[in-house]
Amino acid sequence: MDGARDWLLERTKRPALRLLHATPAGEALLVRLYLEAERHAERAAPWEPMLANAPRWLAAWLDRHRAEERRHAELFAGRLRALTAETDEADDAGDARSGFDAVSRRKLAALHRLVVAAAPAFGAGALVPALAIAWRMEEMGVRVFARHVDVLACDRPDAPLLPVLQVVLADERRHARACRRSVERLVNDRERPALAALVERIDRIERRLGVLGALLLLTSGGLLWMRAKLRRTATRRIAASPR
């Protein structure tokens, strides 16, 4: 079942990326979603208070991680300004964004419940599930950005967004490795089966909501492309009509 779901995600998201890059509004939607994700990562997740008792080595790494997420947000904000000319963010993609926001809220709520439920299974408490979620979300980010880099490198190698994504992808790969090392450092041998079960539950939440997000991407890309085409057709007709 998971293999079929992964196949569907891949077959849906690549065409969605191509459709979204067919219009400036579509690319702006993608960049805005990335920007919001990076800003969320910079502020840390809703379970940040549970990390208040993190050991010094972990707190220092979290500070560095947050600084890099802030840099990613600045890169995406710069690209968004170039696309939108710093106009109001309310545009044709607004309805699509609200759909993605709803998916994100559902995912965050499910993950927050998981942190609370899993914490008693580990000597380090909520630190372990919170960092395990960070690890798996970073791994998801690596897949998202790697897919996008691959699509642009093949279809639009001169796209201004490509070097931005390449920088972010390199950092996300490093973040994923660091998160995994941090989690493994916090658990003992007896807790490793519980950690494996926790990771499977995290991945299950991501897979379940990932299909919905992919379909929203594809639908939004198609709608924005159709809207842009209709506008171009209307403009040509107006220009060709007798004065």
Task: Report the location of each language-model feature.
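Non-heme di-metal
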Residues: 1-243
